[in-house]
Amino acid sequence: MAMQVQFEASTDTSAEEESFGPEPISRLEQCGINANDVKKLEEAGYHTVESVAHAPKKELLNIKGISEAKADKILAEAAKLVPMGFTTATEFHQRRSEIIQITTGSKELDKLLQGGIETGSITELFGEFRTGKTQLCHTLAVTCQLPIDRGGGEGKAMYIDTEGTFRPERLLAVAERYGLSGSDVLDNVAYARGFNTDHQTQLLYQASAMMAESRYALLIVDSATALYRTDYSGRGELSARQMHLARFLRMLLRLADEFGVAVVITNQVVAQVDGAAMFAADPKKPIGGNIIAHASTTRLYLRKGRGETRICKIYDSPCLPEAEAMFAINADGVGDAKE
């Protein structure tokens, strides 16, 4: 029998659990902040106390009706509710040990990533077409709904698709493999198609509001950079493109920090055409430059192997050694290579 997967809204959790989740913005009213000002913050896209506490003062001043004195008071009250000072490495280590990892569907790939895709940070998948980026995203959208003891994140998935490659049929095939109810799995995936870079950013404001209402474990953006290649062209617009991209990635990082979701973005590659390319073993590099390199916590390079096998290499990570693993793309999602 297919297992049912349903998640309760995070807002009506017990007081004990609430200390771990983000604080709803309404908490500021209890701290003496005017209800109208709280409403203005919410309309501007701030749905949690954390999002306000982490925001620079000039961002709050851009909100109509928020004066400098009000901004100072709001930030002071938010800082009291959100710990933002120094902590010992021991405490931080303890918090890190509680981080959930979401299985990729392949034992070899999970071993390479020391458990799976990490929540609370950005993982970037880049590679040529047909290397398994989108297939891995589809598999993760289902595995994140599994119970924690089965390698899941016990939460919903959010999928922002900029290339029109999302296929619900793939999710149903993966759900069947894990014995989950297909209709529940589809209900737990919030899907949006991104049409341009401004719309792509706007969707993150909606994502923030939805995450404040319900428990999400994963946010996928496939692909994070495709629309930037078409909306901005030529060297003349490079600076504007990188600034817009940096702002988008900063918002993703905030969502990962605030809600503890795993953020997975896919990226395309570009062929190097400079002199150094002649001596490089693989003359392809991910697009987005240093901006995306610094924003991603873990960068995974996917390339084709023989037949349906693919190879994943850790390109950059603060804690994982540089290594490779083989995986396969099967009818029921990402799995282990038969070889």
UniProtKB/Swiss-Prot annotation:
Residues 48-77 form the HhH domain. Signal peptide: none annotated. One of its GO terms (biological process) is mitotic recombination-dependent replication fork processing. This is DNA repair protein RAD51 homolog 1. It comes from Gallus gallus. The keyword Nucleus applies. It is found in: Nucleus; Cytoplasm; Chromosome. Belongs to the RecA family. RAD51 subfamily. InterPro entries: AAA+_ATPase, DNA_recomb/repair_Rad51, DNA_recomb/repair_Rad51_C, DNA_recomb/repair_RecA-like, DNA_repair_Rad51/TF_NusA_a-hlx, P-loop_NTPase, RecA_ATP-bd, RecA_monomer-monomer_interface. One of its GO terms (molecular function) is ATP binding. Keywords: ATP-binding, Chromosome, Cytoplasm, DNA-binding, Nucleotide-binding, Nucleus. Plays an important role in homologous strand exchange, a key step in DNA repair through homologous recombination (HR). Binds to single-stranded DNA in an ATP-dependent manner to form nucleoprotein filaments which are essential for the homology search and strand exchange. Catalyzes the recognition of homology and strand exchange between homologous DNA partners to form a joint molecule between a processed DNA break and the repair template. Recruited to resolve stalled replication forks during replication stress. Also involved in interstrand cross-link repair. The gene is RAD51A.
